[in-house]
Regions:
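Conserved Asp/Asn-Gly motif in the active-site loop of CheY-like receiver
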Residues: 30-34, 90, 108
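C-terminal output helix
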Residues: 106-115
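Acidic, metal-coordinating helix/loop segments flanking the phosphotransfer/catalytic sites
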Residues: 29-48
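Short, glycine/charged-rich "phosphate-handling" switch motifs in NTP-dependent
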Residues: 99
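Charged docking surfaces used in two-component/phosphorelay signaling
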Residues: 14-22
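Receiver (REC) domain active-site loop signature in two-component systems and cognate sites
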Residues: 55
């Protein structure tokens, strides 16, 4: 099972990569929403996208809306992982099609718990 980590911070991508690889996911990475969209358009469709909101070129919100416009990608689970903590931003992301929302800073358990709720992880392993 693949996870696409979308964040302009290499350090954050590394943190998220460590968390999801320990769960058994294979990872792909993108530094912005456009790079992530290019992965999807090339035929590499992951089970999960972990998405930052604030990125250059294409932000996470725009990425979510574009993914939801394409019926071929309807099964991709989208989880925002961002510093945007205003209630309105959270509602906006979920209304656009994100499944979950985690606010930075976070603990690894926060990510694992959300993935368990989404059915992507069972007993600490990718389902």
């Amino acid at each position: 099972m693949h996870a696409l980590i979308i964040d302009d911070s290499r350090a954050m991508r590394s943190i998220l990569r460590r968390i999801v690889t320990e769960l058994g996911f294979e990872t792909l990475e993108a530094g912005n929403g456009q790079e992530a969209l290019d992965h999807l358009e090339s035929g590499t469709v992951p089970a999960l996208c972990l998405i930052d909101w604030n990125m250059p070129v294409m932000d996470g919100y725009t990425f979510v809306t574009k993914v939801r416009e394409n019926p071929d990608w309807r099964d991709v689970t989208l989880m925002m992982v961002t510093t945007e903590s205003e209630h309105g931003q959270i509602v906006r992301a979920l209304a656009a099609g994100a499944h979950e929302y985690v606010i930075k800073p976070f603990t690894p358990d926060a990510i694992v718990d959300k993935l368990e709720l989404l059915g992507l992880v069972r007993d600490g392993v990718a389902a």
